[in-house]
């Protein structure tokens, strides 16, 4: 991570590659103009990639074990170009109910009107996924773990079943996985049979909550379709954002390991608090998904869910949130700062919903001193009960 994506042709002597603000690129000869690499490894036109995006893609590919990667303008654009690359009118896509809600709504509200059949499935469907696959299925979309509820797919099982059923039907099904929570530091999906990994690099890659960025990591078979989808839709990542993403990667391991440690301590403390019904965090030994997490991941993200002991009214929640000293309220996560927000299940969620009837919170552990974070939570939960 420290030295990937630092080719001399990009750096020109600088330690970090300066942002290249350019749309038009000048060729030195007709031969150079005619002969540039058609897999877009060269700097030929701003929308096709800059030295900053090329370096970021190179570094991420090395870290994730990908053949090539594609940098995009956000995590949602990464999902868009991937889905659009493999789905056409009349095709069927299976989407986990545990997906990031804007991703699920992208499938239902954007792709479905174009004639794509969208079907959701429980994140713990297991062998039951075989019955959902049909000749028109072209994509299976996973997220590990689930957003909000943090179930863990049995990825090995799902991949095996999809491949077997696809072979029986004589079809080609692309398996896509959103790997934002663990990142390539703690999980490498392509090594587990996944075809395409999508990453909201806005989160841990950038790491400082100051840039929007997405990355799609591809196998050799999936790369050209994904890259073409980005080109046809005019989706690319800016040089400044790629600069910040590449800079963030240099310290990502140190940040994520410390945040993981903080999250584990916070999860353990919350699990013993009387105001908390359940902590949704697979790395914790008390999680019902701990064994699957241990089988799949080498570490964990610092995002978790919290189910409180009852449904709290708005004024009580205001007592909790409005006076937190370290935990801030804000969308997104993955930066150095700790965040705490009230949340709810996805609009399309239908499985196990009764388990989440009480007030549901989402917590992101940052880099602050963990004792200070726990003290902030202790005071906040006391205010919640007193309100």
Regions found by a protein language model. Name each.
Residues 1-37, 386-387:
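N-terminal glycine-rich, Lys/His-bearing helix-loop that initiates the first secondary-structure elements
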Residues 3-10, 68-275, 280, 291:
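Conserved PLP-enzyme active-site core in the AAT-like
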Residues 6-8, 21-27, 181-183, 203, ...:
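Glycine-rich beta-alpha junction loops
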Residues 24-77, 103-109:
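Conserved N-terminal alpha-helix of the aminotransferase class I/II PLP-enzyme fold
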Residues 26-30, 223-224, 311-315, 347-348, ...:
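Short, acidic Gly/Pro/Ser/Thr-rich loop/turn segments
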Residues 108-109, 117-119, 138, 160, ...:
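PLP-dependent enzyme catalytic core of the Aspartate aminotransferase-like
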Residues 234-235, 322-332, 380-387:
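A common structural junction motif
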Residues 278-361, 365:
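Conserved C-terminal alpha-helix-loop-beta "cap" of PLP-dependent enzymes
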